[in-house]
Amino acid sequence: MSRLSSIYSQHRTSGLRSDRSIMPNSTSNSLRTISSVHLPYNHRARNFHISHAVGDSSEHVIINGQASPSKVVQADAAALGTIAADMAPVVDGFSADDDELDLDSPTEGFSSIPEAIEDIRQGKYVIVVDDEDRENEGDLIMAASKVTPEAMAFIVRHGTGIVCVSMKEDDLERLELPLMVTTKENEEKLRTAFTVSVDAKEGTTTGVSAKDRANTVLALASPNSKPEDFNRPGHIFPLKYREGGVLKRAGHTEASVDLAMLAGLPPAAVLCEIVDDDDGSMALLPKLQDFARRENLKIISIADLIRYRRKRDRLVERVCVTPLQLQWGSFQSYCYRSLIDGMEHIAMVKGDVGDGQDILVRVHSECLTGDIFGSARCDCGNQLALAMTMIEKTGRGVVVYLRGHEGRGIGLGHKLRAYNLQDDGRDTVEANEDLGLPVDSREYGIGAQILRDLGVRTMRLMTNNPAKYTGLKGYGLSVLGRVPLLTPITNENRRYMETKRLKMGHVYGTRPSGNTSTLADGGIKKEQDQIDSASEQE
């Protein structure tokens, strides 16, 4: 067998009769079909019709199968290899500058996160920009505990005039500052959690001057303030920070408090959106960068702050460890739970990791259709099976199975919709783009921290995807080299694999992606022949 699910094994043994559904115990009335797609299947020459349904906030798959002519795994399929593939590290395929892959290296045109943290610590302003698909705007941000009347005047002069203070929920409750509207009633586009506005009672007059607003901000940031110290409503707008910060919500509210805490200051920050001096509209990135240069301010992106925190924060906890006898052999299974979203992941460990040096590693993204049902559209299930076989043969290694990566991060339903678009002529990249979804939104920080917890320090990474090298770098892990996972090409997955090579930089065999021949020309078969030849010479 070449699949990892006992459910799948049972169904295959029983012949997987037509109209058999793999579903939780529920009635059909509790489910809503979202999408369906014809799915060629890698085993027993069958085709299936997959329906994607949603019920009780969970996604389910209904499989209806029937026998079809043997056309899925072609007799003339170009073999990309089996266990005979060379298992020595290959480093030339993913050549890259270390600085380019450094998680602390800022996005081009932005300052580094450590620089911004230091400026926040010193009571300076920082410009924080969010994603272009979100607001694509910038906020002036500084630590609330460091605000001065002069700083407030600068913020009001260059901002909208709506000055907010982001705060943790505990402090808002201590000061008895309820939300302006309930979460259910909040119709603001990004669901920003405004509380009732306030002015400090002491040291203010109208409450609107720069001096008055600075005093109000300082009072909000003080751990000694009490509910009776404020008038309601007022001219400062507290915002409720979501626990987990930018790892939970990629907003300015969360970014500002994260920066204050990273600077070792009280968890409260001033923020105000920056306007274009020319026409009063919201300033977008080019104008924000001009403003930063003119005022000698650091400018950072929330995306960079997310990467910074992912590298340093503890993202997972070990739940349990148990031995498992798998079809490949005996493994120790480690369950981990994400501290960000509660998702559970699993690592299969063979042998003794020991000092963590030179470990054969596969970080595998969940693919229900490929890993469980043997879809011929992709090579995911075959890669997983080959990785497990290689580790079993080596006697020492780790497979980290990351859930929540379905469809390169777009989810099961969207993946099936993308399949329908591929049937209409798009490739795997174009289908995601037509749906308005990212081509690949996966993050590998969870996987990296699991490997660290298991004791892995240096590894031979089994992958054809350079993004995994990038995603695992910077977590105290060293990638000694790449081990290609060369699996069979079929008529069903040929275009998919060619698209990954041409548009996503995947590397098959030992050559850099720019030099690999096309799949249609049998180039990967030639690569495999070269690997086999090299193995024989060794």
From Swiss-Prot:
Region described as DHBP synthase: spans on this chain: 46-311
Domain of life per record: Eukaryota
HAMAP family: RibA, RibB, RibBA
Binding site for Mg(2+) 2: E135, H252
PANTHER family: BIFUNCTIONAL RIBOFLAVIN BIOSYNTHESIS PROTEIN RIBA 1, CHLOROPLASTIC-RELATED, GTP CYCLOHYDROLASE II-RELATED
Polar residues bias (residue ranges): 1-16
Phylogenetic classification of the source organism: Eukaryota, Viridiplantae, Streptophyta, Embryophyta, Tracheophyta
Molecular functions (GO terms): 3,4-dihydroxy-2-butanone-4-phosphate synthase activity; GTP binding; GTP cyclohydrolase II activity; metal ion binding
Subcellular location: Plastid, Chloroplast
Entry keywords, A to Z: Chloroplast, GTP-binding, Hydrolase, Lyase, Magnesium, Manganese, Metal-binding, Multifunctional enzyme, Nucleotide-binding, Plastid, Riboflavin biosynthesis, Transit peptide, Zinc
Residue numbers spanned by region Disordered: 1-29, 506-538
Location of the transit peptide in the chain: 1-73
Cofactor dependency: Mg(2+); Mn(2+); Zn(2+)
Region (GTP cyclohydrolase II): 312-530
The protein's name in its UniProt record: Probable bifunctional riboflavin biosynthesis protein RIBA 1, chloroplastic
Residues involved in D-ribulose 5-phosphate binding: R134, E135, D139, R249, A250, G251, H252, T253, E273
Binding site for Mg(2+) 1: E135
Enzyme Commission code(s) on record: 4.1.99.12, 3.5.4.25
Organism: Oryza sativa subsp. japonica (Rice)
GO cellular component: chloroplast
Co-factor: note: Binds 2 divalent metal cations per subunit. Magnesium or manganese.
Active site: D440 (proton acceptor), R442 (nucleophile)
InterPro entries: DHBP_synth_RibB-like_a/b_dom (IPR017945), DHBP_synthase_RibB (IPR000422), GTP_cyclohydro_II (IPR032677), RibA (IPR000926), RibA-like_sf (IPR036144), Riboflavin_synth_RibBA (IPR016299)
Chain positions recorded as GTP binding sites: R362, V363, H364, S365, E366, Q383, E406, G407, R408, T428, T463, K468
Function: Involved in riboflavin biosynthesis. Catalyzes both the conversion of D-ribulose 5-phosphate to formate and 3,4-dihydroxy-2-butanone 4-phosphate and the conversion of GTP to 2,5-diamino-6-ribosylamino-4(3H)-pyrimidinone 5'-phosphate (DARP), formate and pyrophosphate.
